[in-house]
Amino acid sequence: MVGFLRALTAASAVPAAAAVAAVALSTNSSSSSRLRLPSPASLPSLSSAYAAAPASGSARKPNAVPPMAAAAATADLSAAADKGAALPELMTEFMVDMKCDGCVTAVKNKFQTLEGIKNIEVDLNNQVVRVLGSLPVNTMLDTLHQTGRDARLIGQGNPNDFLVSAAVAEFKGPVIFGVVRLAQVNMELAIVEATFSGLSPGKHGWSINEFGDLTRGAESTGKVYNPSDYRSNKPLGDLGTLEAGEKGEAQFSASKEKLKVVDLIGRSIALYATEDRSDPGIAAAVIARSAGVGENYKKLCTCDGVTIWESS
């Protein structure tokens, strides 16, 4: 009898053990398949695939950037400026002094010879040329002037996607003159373009600073702008260096990750005599909102009667 009970117990234990083994095997298989999923480190970085993020001021906060990734973004800005790397595609709008269909053809033909131009639209009635491409603004303006026609930048970016898609800071002398343009490409990326004259030859540090207070020039603009959720060994507003040639002129074109144009309005851009920004600063200008595409078809300034072609 005892032998019979032992045999019965052993026989019933076999299916149970098999069931436990099956469950364990299923669990291990599931764990194994989860482990085979790509880790975050193997996914494309923001520098190679610009993922859309919620607009500034929305309920969701943008994910914090790992220190190394943010540092790389800052390094990429300087590298792009030094090597003349192509900028991201952006819609840019110009007002061009066109009077006939021949003008339209001349403008289109000129742009079609350039690399980095994806599409061009010409509105003869409004004298407007819209260019989708990755060339700096100055290059496109020079191209328009080469057709023998006056041209003015009137808009950048896409105001349908952003509350503020473009901004500008103007340096009006008496020694240093220049303009800095900022345009939002997407919520993770902005373009910074600058042209300066009147600088001493050599390298100059420059940055986006916290305040737009110019009562004491660059000295009263505060620290380098750095939002609280930005993690890097360098502040987000650090724009690296400008290198002025023998004539005191400098140009800069690069993209910068995590920079949101809407958050920069009312702050300032400051220039320094030294590369490390150890001096009080030599010039500064307030960052102001600039027109987006389709927002500025005005040809006459109502305040002084100056036409767009007469303005500097």
UniProtKB/Swiss-Prot annotation:
Gene3D superfamilies in the record: 3.30.70.100, Superoxide dismutase, copper/zinc binding domain
Gene Ontology process terms (BP): removal of superoxide radicals
Keyword DNA-binding set for record: no
UniProt xrefs under InterPro entries: HMA_dom (IPR006121), HMA_dom_sf (IPR036163), SOD-like_Cu/Zn_dom_sf (IPR036423), SOD_Cu/Zn_/chaperone (IPR024134), SOD_Cu_Zn_dom (IPR001424)
Presence of keyword Chaperone: yes
Main location (coarse class): plastid
Protein name: Copper chaperone for superoxide dismutase, chloroplastic
Gene name per UniProt: CCS
